[in-house]
């Protein structure tokens, strides 16, 4: 039985955010590297470092928290896995959903690599909807 590395990333980030931890450590694979670069570019992480320990590569992610007047350093990320190994979900470029009117991000695996919903619409290509983040 294979591992769902995308679900592991989502779970690690969600658990660290709910625990108010600023740093998350996830295993490094080709797909996780692409997803982490994309989320860093979209502003969900402050910093990403590659770390090697016992011949295994890891990413050390620093979560971005927004300051709030009532509760400092509080920003709960919402992540939802859509396509999974048992049920793949594909959309054409015209049918890609918008999350919170465009404030959220849909991560899509296309024939040209992993990209956001905005990039996929601009290029006019669809693909597998991996997850939502807002």
Swiss-Prot record:
Gene3D superfamilies in the cross-refs: 3.30.1370.30, 3.30.1490.10
A single BP term in Gene Ontology: translation
UniProt KW ATP-binding keyword: no
PROSITE patterns for this protein: RIBOSOMAL_S8
Subcellular localization(s) per the UniProt record: Plastid
GO cellular component: plastid; ribonucleoprotein complex; ribosome
Single GO term (MF): rRNA binding
Keyword line: Plastid, Ribonucleoprotein, Ribosomal protein, RNA-binding, rRNA-binding
Any Pfam family: Ribosomal_S8
Function field: One of the primary rRNA binding proteins, it binds directly to 16S rRNA central domain where it helps coordinate assembly of the platform of the 30S subunit.
Subunit-level organization: Part of the 30S ribosomal subunit.
Family of this protein: Belongs to the universal ribosomal protein uS8 family.
UniProt-listed PANTHER family: 40S RIBOSOMAL PROTEIN S15A
NCBIfam families (UniProt xref): PRK00136.1 (NF001109)
Record-linked HAMAP family: Ribosomal_uS8_B
Protein name, as recorded: Small ribosomal subunit protein uS8c
Originating species: Cuscuta exaltata
């Amino acid at each position: 039985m294979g591992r769902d590395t995308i679900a592991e990333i989502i779970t690690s980030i969600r658990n660290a955010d709910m625990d108010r931890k600023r740093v998350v450590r996830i295993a490094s694979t080709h797909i996780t590297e692409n997803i982490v670069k994309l989320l860093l570019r979209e502003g969900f992480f402050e910093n990403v470092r590659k770390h090697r320990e016992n011949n295994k590569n890891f990413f050390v992610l620093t979560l971005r928290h927004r300051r709030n007047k009532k509760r400092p350093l509080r920003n709960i990320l919402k992540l939802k896995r859509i396509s999974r190994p048992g049920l793949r979900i594909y959309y054409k470029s015209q049918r890609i959903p918008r999350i919170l009117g465009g404030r959220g991000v849909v991560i899509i695996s296309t024939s040209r690599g992993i990209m956001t919903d905005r990039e996929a619409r601009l290029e006019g290509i669809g693909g597998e909807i991996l997850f939502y983040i807002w």
